Amino acid sequence: MNYQSEWLRIDPIKGSRRFSNLCWAFILVLGAIGFSLVGFSSYLGRDLIPILSSQQIIFLPQGIVMCFYGIAGIFLGFYLWCTILWNVGSGYNQFNKREGIVYLFRWGFPGENRRICIRFMIKDIQAIRMEIQEGFSPRRVLYLRIKGQQDVPLTRLDEELTLREMEEKAAELARFLRVSIEGF
C-alpha cells in the first residue's frame, strides 16, 4: 500500500507485528509453560497437570533442566510479545522531491531512541542497489547507495519478495528518483 504523487512517495515498512511472529510467540510460551510445569511437578512429586506426566522424571538433574528451559522460554516469549506489541522495525520510507529530502523512519524499542529517523538529500543518492542471493535461504534486499556513506537498506532483510516484485519495486523507485539501478 504505497502512496505516490508527482512530488512525494511513501513506502510503508512492516515491523515485527506479523502472523508468523504471533504464531512463534504463542508456541514458545505454551512450550515454556509446559516445561516449567513438568519441572515443578517432578519437584513436588505429583502431576500439576494430568496430561503432562512427570512420574519418570527425577528432579535432579532432569527436573531442574526442565525448569530452567521453561523459565528461559518464558523470558524469550515475553521479549517476543513485547516486540510484537511495540511493532519494532515498522515505519516508512518517504521520498520528497519538492524538499529534496529522503526520510527513513522506524520504530525501535521504548526508551530514548524509540523513534529512529534518518534524513539525507536526494541529490546525494547515487543509485538503487539490489542484492540478490539465491539458495537455501534466499536474500533479496534493496539499498540506497549514497555518496560518501554506507548503503542504506530500504527493505527488511527477511522480506519475502519474488525476483520480479523486487525488480519492479527497484525500477519504480529509480524512475521516481531518476537514478540508476545496480545489481549485486
From Swiss-Prot:
Name of the featured protein: Photosystem I assembly protein Ycf4
Family assignment from sequence similarity: Belongs to the Ycf4 family.
HAMAP family: Ycf4
Species assigned in the record: Angiopteris evecta (Mule's foot fern)
NCBIfam families: PRK02542.1 (NF002712)
Job description of the protein: Seems to be required for the assembly of the photosystem I complex.
InterPro entries in UniProt: PSI_Ycf4_assembly
Subcellular location: Plastid, Chloroplast thylakoid membrane
Transmembrane segments: 22-42, 64-84
Annotated GO CC locations: chloroplast thylakoid membrane; photosystem I
Membrane disposition: Multi-pass membrane protein
Keywords: Chloroplast, Membrane, Photosynthesis, Plastid, Thylakoid, Transmembrane, Transmembrane helix
Superkingdom per UniProt: Eukaryota
Gene Ontology BP terms: photosynthesis
